[in-house]
Amino acid sequence: LRPDRATIVYSNRAREAFGADVPIIIGGLEASLRRFAHYDYWDDKVRRSILVDSGADMLVYGMAEYAEREIARRLKKKIPVSEMRDIRGTAFLAHDAAECEFDSVTLPSFADVCDSKRFYADATRIEYAEHDPVRGRALIQEHDGRYLIVNPPAMPLETKELDRVAELTYTKQYQPMYEPLGGVPAI
């Protein structure tokens, strides 16, 4: 079965197995929703960005079609992930907030959102306000001396690109673990 906080667990295991030479890029729903300091119901406390706890090199959020293609193109050219600071729909940790390559807004720090519900609410309000692919800015949040830099969201797909995605041969199968429950009726 899948462990709790699977992205953190698997990312750390991959780092142990492959070392620092292999870039680890996390994405998906868990990474997207936990990219900023966030409230965790299991621990009943505010946790750091999943990027901090996972030890990954980069986080891709949202649908990520553009970001994944651009990252793959650059990796093919042997460009290190540490130099991929300008890709929309991605996030990374930096030692200096000046490493952000977009117009940006600074959020209350991890320490501040842990200590104050008001700061937590302010950070959440800003995150939502800036989550617009056309006018959204990068968001910066300090985490224990490092800076989480979340680049603006990716631009939406054009009609032809969206059609190509819709035409992919999806299996439309549910996870086998749902078999004893009779499957997933919606599929």
Where do the model's predicted regions map?
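N-terminal [4Fe-4S]-dependent radical SAM core
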Residues: 121-187
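Glycine-rich beta-alpha loop elements in corrinoid/cobalamin-binding modules
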Residues: 1-143, 150-151
